């Protein structure tokens, strides 16, 4: 594969980065194998070995992977920290932090290695992970040869892109290429899983975003969903934001803070997650505010209650006005 005159100047740099990431992943697999741990590639590194395997033109900054258990994750972290890695946050291996975050981030100590996110479940977002039923467990069970099943992979990637407001074009491209590779039966299975695992809004938003970016042929797939009144309102809300969010803008900062809420399918789940936001567990509170000592929670609990209560009301008003 050689660059052509029509390809952007960054093409060779992207390919070099891609090859470095692939080489790093093979090294990590070898390290994991020496301690009897199986890892499952996620996101970019997974796609580089599947739909982008021939072109290698998908930018990847770091490596996301999944361990099948918390114990395997701890063992792999210990192994990699003996080599060229260190924990991004020293508290991330505490039981309460693992329960809240569901992943551990490792930073590279050398320029020839890339940063790593080691998941213990596929979906780690604090609200999504609690509202998708048994998806995480079922998706792991359906893995074949340490790879996620295709429709599970699409839903996983869609929720990640939705969480980040579809702000990067590469995520939409990933979803489109995966959809193009699906048979009609797989598309039907995808719709069934979206209903089963409460991924309806995520799926609707992803397909709607693809349609708005020129993939009009997917309108038929969108029409396969019998939209409720609240789902139509949700799509209007999502469609009202077409610019990249800028966290320096107060409104954008507010929307991004609560964006995940809008994608939760069931009203009772949204209310349950709101209660958790108002009254977080010690692990979640520690993760949000990077609390270093247990005593500091006495200050952060009332602070969180005031801030979360005020901003959630503002978000609710904004959602109503925008939809």
Language-model-derived ranges and their functions:
Residues 1-61, 67-323:
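Conserved NTP-donor binding/palm subdomain of two-metal-ion nucleotidyltransferases/polymerases, i.e.
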């Amino acid at each position: 594969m050689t660059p052509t005159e029509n390809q952007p100047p960054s093409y060779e740099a992207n390919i070099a980065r891609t090859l470095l990431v692939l080489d790093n992943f093979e090294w990590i697999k070898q390290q994991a194998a020496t301690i009897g741990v199986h890892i499952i590639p996620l996101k970019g590194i997974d796609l580089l070995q599947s739909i982008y395997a021939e072109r290698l033109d998908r930018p990847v900054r770091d490596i996301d992977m999944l361990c099948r258990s918390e114990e395997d994750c701890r063992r792999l972290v210990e192994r990699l920290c003996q080599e060229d890695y260190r924990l991004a946050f020293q508290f991330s291996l505490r039981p309460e932090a693992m329960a809240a975050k569901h992943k551990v981030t490792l930073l590279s100590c050398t320029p020839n290695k890339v940063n790593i996110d080691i998941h213990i479940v596929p979906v780690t977002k604090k609200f999504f992970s609690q509202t998708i039923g048994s998806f995480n467990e079922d998706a792991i069970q359906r893995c074949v040869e340490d790879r996620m099943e295709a429709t599970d992979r699409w839903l996983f990637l869609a929720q990640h892109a939705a969480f980040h407001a579809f702000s990067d074009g590469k995520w939409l491209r990933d979803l489109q290429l995966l959809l193009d590779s699906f048979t009609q039966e797989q598309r039907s299975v995808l719709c069934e899983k979206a209903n089963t695992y409460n991924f309806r809004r995520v799926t609707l938003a992803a397909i709607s975003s693809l349609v708005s970016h020129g993939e009009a042929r997917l309108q038929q797939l969108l029409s396969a969903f019998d939209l409720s009144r609240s789902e139509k309102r949700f799509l209007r809300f999502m469609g009202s934001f077409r610019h990249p969010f800028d966290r320096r803008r107060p409104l954008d900062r507010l929307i991004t803070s609560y964006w995940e809420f809008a994608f939760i399918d069931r009203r009772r789940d949204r209310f349950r997650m709101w209660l958790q936001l108002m009254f977080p567990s010690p692990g979640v509170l520690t993760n949000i505010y990077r609390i270093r000592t247990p005593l500091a929670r006495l200050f952060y609990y009332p602070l969180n209650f005031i801030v979360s209560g005020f901003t959630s009301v503002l978000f609710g008003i904004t959602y109503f006005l925008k939809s």
